[in-house]
Amino acid sequence: MIVNYLKHKFYNLLTTMIVLFIFVLSGAIFLTFLGFGLYGLSRILIYFRLGDFTYNRSMYDNLLYYGSYIIFGYFIIFAVEHLMDYFRKMLPENAYFRGATFHLISYTVATTLFYFIIHLNYVYINIDFWVIMVIIGFLYVCKLQFYPESKNLNNRK
């Protein structure tokens, strides 16, 4: 009975460790690709003199500083999008929550909140507001293009 219990517990622990390993590995790969993409974006902004990144410590300090900027910004934009979707579901008859007006309001609120809540607190990242508007606008258009609003993309009726 005890051997059976320990054997069952070992399999559960092994399965949990495999799932955790896959989760950590895929997260590390994602963060690596994100880092390369952001490094390229920062080089483009520096080359065209649209941004200045003056925080330069060790690799891990830089990763933490610039990574937290991106992660906090993502959470702000994610929260705004979900809040706007919630408002649209709760007020379906309101003209502000339909069509292009809805997307313009979502984009404006997300960009403004990102700038005032996140960007102004990171003193070593100097990017003008209009450049942030263009970058977030491009990402918003990509989101609309690649993740269209629909009930079920696999519904073939």
Curated annotation (Swiss-Prot):
Listed InterPro entries: SepA
Protein name: Multidrug resistance efflux pump SepA
Keyword set, alphabetical order: Cell membrane, Membrane, Transmembrane, Transmembrane helix, Transport
Transmembrane parts of this sequence: 18-38, 63-83, 100-120, 122-142
UniProt key word Heme: no
Signal peptide, first to last residue: none
Family label: Belongs to the multidrug resistance efflux pump SepA family.
Keyword Cell membrane carried by entry: yes
Location(s), subcellular: Cell membrane
GO cellular-component term (any): plasma membrane
Function of the molecule: Involved in multidrug efflux.
Topology within the bilayer: Multi-pass membrane protein
